[in-house]
């Protein structure tokens, strides 16, 4: 069965869907039959996005990565923000998407 709504679910919801499809196809089938799969994935997507944004903010604040650094040394700011985003993504993946 093709889940055509998947394009309307954000990237985090799509990642969780792919994980469930591979590791828990029965869960997907039950939610399909109940008609709850799309909303479930949208909720996962929102929770993961909120967590990601919060983590990026917390990590950048705690490490002093701010607009002043961006003005003074843009390359260091980009490098630091990429590192922060990568760490936040790993946390969200392990705690929300692959859980």
Positions of PLM-derived features:
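Extended, charged helical/alpha-beta scaffold domains that provide interaction surfaces
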Residues: 1-99
């Amino acid at each position: 069965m093709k889940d055509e709504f998947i394009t309307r679910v954000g990237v985090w919801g799509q990642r969780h869907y792919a994980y469930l499809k591979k590791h828990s196809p029965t869960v997907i089938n039950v939610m399909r039959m109940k008609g709850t799969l799309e909303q479930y994935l949208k909720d996962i997507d929102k929770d993961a996005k909120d967590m990601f944004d919060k983590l990026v903010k917390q990590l950048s604040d705690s490490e002093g990565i701010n607009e002043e650094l961006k003005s003074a040394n843009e390359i260091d700011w980009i490098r630091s923000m990429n590192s922060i985003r990568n760490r936040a993504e790993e946390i969200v993946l392990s705690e929300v998407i692959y859980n």
